[in-house]
From Swiss-Prot:
InterPro entries membership: FabA_FabZ (IPR013114), FabZ (IPR010084), HotDog_dom_sf (IPR029069)
HAMAP family the UniProt entry points to: FabZ
GO molecular function: (3R)-hydroxyacyl-[acyl-carrier-protein] dehydratase activity
SUPFAM superfamilies according to UniProt: Thioesterase/thiol ester dehydrase-isomerase
Principal localisation: cytoplasm
Active-site residues annotated for this sequence: H56
Name used for this protein in its record: 3-hydroxyacyl-[acyl-carrier-protein] dehydratase FabZ
Subcellular location field: Cytoplasm
Reactions it catalyzes: a (3R)-hydroxyacyl-[ACP] = a (2E)-enoyl-[ACP] + H2O
Lineage: Bacteria, Pseudomonadati, Pseudomonadota, Alphaproteobacteria, Hyphomicrobiales
Family membership: Belongs to the thioester dehydratase family. FabZ subfamily.
GO term, biological process aspect, one: lipid A biosynthetic process
GO-annotated cellular components: cytoplasm; membrane
Length: 151
């Protein structure tokens, strides 16, 4: 008999214990629906107080697409670290690859971005994921990203 699929949710406190990233470069607020090292959804609440909006663009703030890609990578890092270590002890995680990146719609202050990550490959402590950034169910960006744990 197969064991039931277990979903996990982690809050900002667990993310802070898991990733080495800190303000202003911690770009996810929580990760929900983590299914082992296979999938999960990172959540980012975008506010007008984001440091990037000081220059991107003051008169019409648009959340930078590259920060959404980093949010996908951080979500992948949380999924990977928690699946391997099973603890909340920080380890270094590196952004390994980015492919097939597309930006489809602008993200504005007040939006909540969901980073939907699904594993497409794995080798030891390296993972590759397909990521879709969604706002209100619509894809605003997508990319294939890779992450690697380092000792």
């Amino acid at each position: 008999m197969e064991s039931p699929i277990r979903f996990e949710n982690v809050d900002i406190n667990t993310i802070l214990k898991t990733l080495p990233h800190r303000f202003p470069f911690l770009l996810i607020d929580r990760v929900i629906n983590i299914r082992e090292d296979y999938s999960g959804i990172g959540i980012k609440n975008v506010t007008v107080n984001e440091p990037a909006f000081q220059g991107h663009f003051p008169e019409r703030p648009v959340y930078p697409g590259v920060l959404m890609i980093e949010g996908m990578a951080q979500t992948a890092g949380v999924i990977g670290i928690l699946s391997v270590t099973g603890t909340e002890k920080p380890r270094a995680v590196y952004f390994l690859t980015i492919d097939k990146c597309k930006f489809r719609k602008p993200v504005m202050p007040g939006d909540t971005v969901e980073y939907h990550l699904t594993r497409t490959g794995r080798r030891k402590t390296m993972w590759w994921f397909h990521g879709e950034a969604k706002v209100d169910g619509q894809i605003v960006a997508e990319a294939d990203v890779g992450a690697m744990l380092a000792d």
